[in-house]
Amino acid sequence: MPVLAFPGPAAPSPPSVTVEVPDGWDALPAGSDLLRARGTGAAGEPVEVTVRSHTGPVGYAATDLVDALADGVTHPGTEVEPSFVVEIGGREWVARNISWDESSGPVVEVHLAAVVDGPADEAAADEVSRLVVATGRVRGATLDADYDVLQSVLETLVVGGAQ
């Protein structure tokens, strides 16, 4: 009978991740995420960042992940911008902005995904694709100014391991 294990070939340990946040931001309990932080925007609305690990089938790329995340947003009037590539911390990230309106005002969410090298064991590396996804969210009347702060936070992402 097969034995499943964590960490193991189909469930590798998540990579180390760091992100720098402005003074006054709170580190929140991460739950199933790797990191979670929240700050207060210019008009008092929350500015949020989460980082989590994602394991997919072999060949699952960062573009596949941001496409799936965009497909999962079902708010009425959702606008999905084309994905784009950005380099952060020496690593290539695929990013996509998604926006919609809520009763409290506009919301913009940005998803950034990057492939993380697999485990040192070559056989295990052939079983899964390892990725990291960072999600940032801003909302409200000062969305543009808050997005600039969010972007400056996301630009500090560092993922451990080789690229």
Describe these PLM feature segments.
Residues P2-D71, S103-G105:
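Secretory pathway targeting signatures of secreted, lumenal, and periplasmic proteins
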Residues E20, D26, E87, A114, ...:
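Generic structural detector for well-ordered beta-strands
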Residues W25, L131-Q163:
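Surface-exposed amphipathic alpha-helical segments
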Residues W25-A27, T78, W93, L157:
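Short glycine-aromatic motifs
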Residues A37, V51, R96-I98, A113-V115, ...:
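Short beta-strand element of the conserved SAM-dependent methyltransferase core
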Residues E45-T50, E92-A95, V128-T135:
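Glycine-rich, often proline-containing surface loops adjacent to acidic residues and nearby aromatics
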Residues H54-G56, S99-E102, V116-D117, T135-A141:
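Short, flexible beta-strand-to-coil junctions
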Residues V66-A125, Q151:
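Signature of long, low-cysteine stretches enriched in small and polar/charged residues
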